[in-house]
From Swiss-Prot:
Transmembrane segments: none annotated. Phosphoketolase using both fructose 6-phosphate and xylulose 5-phosphate as substrate. Keywords: Lyase, Thiamine pyrophosphate. The lineage of its organism: Bacteria, Bacillati, Actinomycetota, Actinomycetes, Bifidobacteriales. It comes from Bifidobacterium animalis subsp. lactis (strain DSM 10140 / CCUG 37979 / JCM 10602 / LMG 18314 / NRRL B-41405 / UR1). This is Xylulose-5-phosphate/fructose-6-phosphate phosphoketolase. GO terms for biological process: carbohydrate metabolic process. It is an enzyme of class 4 (lyase). NCBIfam families: PRK05261.1-4, PRK05261.1-5.
Amino acid sequence: MTNPVIGTPWQKLDRPVSEEAIEGMDKYWRVANYMSIGQIYLRSNPLMKEPFTRDDVKHRLVGHWGTTPGLNFLLAHINRLIADHQQNTVFIMGPGHGGPAGTAQSYIDGTYTEYYPNITKDEAGLQKFFRQFSYPGGIPSHFAPETPGSIHEGGELGYALSHAYGAIMDNPSLFVPCIIGDGEAETGPLATGWQSNKLVNPRTDGIVLPILHLNGYKIANPTILARISDEELHDFFRGMGYHPYEFVAGFDNEDHLSIHRRFAELFETIFDEICDIKAAAQTDDMTRPFYPMLIFRTPKGWTCPKFIDGKKTEGSWRAHQVPLASARDTEAHFEVLKGWMESYKPEELFNADGSIKEDVTAFMPKGELRIGANPNANGGRIREDLKLPELDQYEITGVKEYGHGWGQVEAPRSLGAYCRDIIKNNPDSFRVFGPDETASNRLNATYEVTKKQWDNGYLSALVDENMAVTGQVVEQLSEHQCEGFLEAYLLTGRHGIWSSYESFVHVIDSMLNQHAKWLEATVREIPWRKPISSVNLLVSSHVWRQDHNGFSHQDPGVTSVLLNKTFNNDHVTNIYFATDANMLLAIAEKCFKSTNKINAIFAGKQPAATWITLDEVRAELEAGAAEWKWASNAKSNDEVQVVLAAAGDVPTQEIMAASDALNKMGIKFKVVNVVDLIKLQSSKENDEAMSDEDFADLFTADKPVLFAYHSYAQDVRGLIYDRPNHDNFTVVGYKEQGSTTTPFDMVRVNDMDRYALQAKALELIDADKYADKINELNEFRKTAFQFAVDNGYDIPEFTDWVYPDVKVDETSMLSATAATAGDNE
């Protein structure tokens, strides 16, 4: 079930933390530190029972020690809190390079062996566990999807808070302690992530506890937050809306049990405050709380040798990765490593058979409350299919009555109505995210059934529209936050969509890349991770109709980023081009049913023609591309003089206008529309692509193909390089030309306008025969541009064109091309 309630959340402890638990946490810390070092350094003899030699050390030492002991300490206490309070909890490890802590945790709580039975709970299993870490044929170095309990790898830094807050949305029983490295805190996404506390509601959402892991250093430099004054540091977090607590340890000779007692007491104080916030949220008190956060100030590399080779190591940047880089190569480093590992007294922590002693784990949670077993961290286990409304009720039916090419419809408005009713049917498992663009991208029908969630004060109904402390729409002007919120919402079993201006999807190129890698690893080799809902991204306000914002807003290149993920038959990315509103609806339905994908859906928001019916759309979407027989005039491929192909709404509009003119000249052509770009890829590279036989039948085996493409032409060239007839393809795409100008001028400067396409088609057929017509078309392009320069709007021959199949009365004759009122939403 989605949003499961596990345990008895938000209950205060009615007694002090037991001394047995304190001792257990110290033993956990020691065993986790020992196992973390073992993962980085050892390939054999995991408990040093046999004579311990340099041959037991790995040849290549890979890993990060510096953050790991602090993470192990915190994990000990989080485990204790979960057990004592029976608190439903997911753990976020921002500094994911502390991966040894995460894998050690899941080994200690037993879930690692449950998912990987070959890693047994004995000396042989421990040796495999150590050896596999960052090793050929083994596991990665970070808190990767291979690790039970992880929903955040923490490889690319910056997204910890975005993922933490996305996980708690509509998940009121969930507690998410989120560890943030003080280096990560310098990244842009993390800096804005602090503001997430204004976008959640403690009544309907869970609670995030940010824990700043302030160990003072990055790879080779101090961290900014570690060097400002305590007053400035605390004031910063108060300004972000938090109540900061600070814990300092490891800089003197304080006994470790004393440190654990102090931290356990502080952790209970913090959790009591959280319980009070949750209790107050059930009353009529609507005041936004100052949520607690913890500054955890400890030495980098805590408990490692204080000096190595005469240089300060513990408490310095030198502890960041592998403090003893020559442990196999030099006796001096090896002896230091041996003494370091012996300092944790493994003989007190492991049984004779190599299993962990029961008194180490007695304080830890059991069953699904274990960090590695919580179903929220394997969201596919609790995911339920969306209750989707029938799509037919949203169809633009005018195309049936008035003909192909009818109307002036803003396609995303239809999607907005569809999302509205999805929210109605799934009120606590579907969200819409946007970087201040939900209305601009025409999804505002959602406000008919929900609000924008906002817990940051209200001024007046005159200016604060569609806002409430609870709602299924979340807006923050941060593409990072939108993508991060949605990813975590999906990773914990729910569904959603977010929209962005096309050019600014590039802001989160690398986030898409990271999520794709998570999905790739999952579908290749982690069968126990059940499929999660797909990232659905509406890419609107696109290059061809950004005429009111200009060159900076004109970049469709996210297609190229996603195409890099289409190999190996992992099938984790899709690129869809919605030709019209009906196409967009069918694409959305398919995407909302899909799992383990990143679905990029390209759809303009300006008024545009409706070309095909919903039934026609479904057939085309199934195939990925289709001939529009009603638009073709060639009866067979043998009769074709040129294939006119398009992907994208504006390229389709211009190809259709060109086809109208070519038809009047008697040119024989077929019209092909592409909706699912990746279906064009060679079937040798992609087993879901169309076959070479189908490709040749669609595009012909030997006729020239003029392909008008929404994005950069090299996308298509790269996809079809090994296809039949690929040498006969002429691809026209965005050529990095644009400005704040008119719709015609945008297509003109990129040779995408109908006149340029008509001329190019004639050139491909017989350049000499049609030389005069080609010159005439090129001259008209100059005339049309000059008209726009002189008048400030496009020439009527361009704006008044309507596809000849359209049958309308005088009151609805305005063409979609002429509907250029701009974007005032």
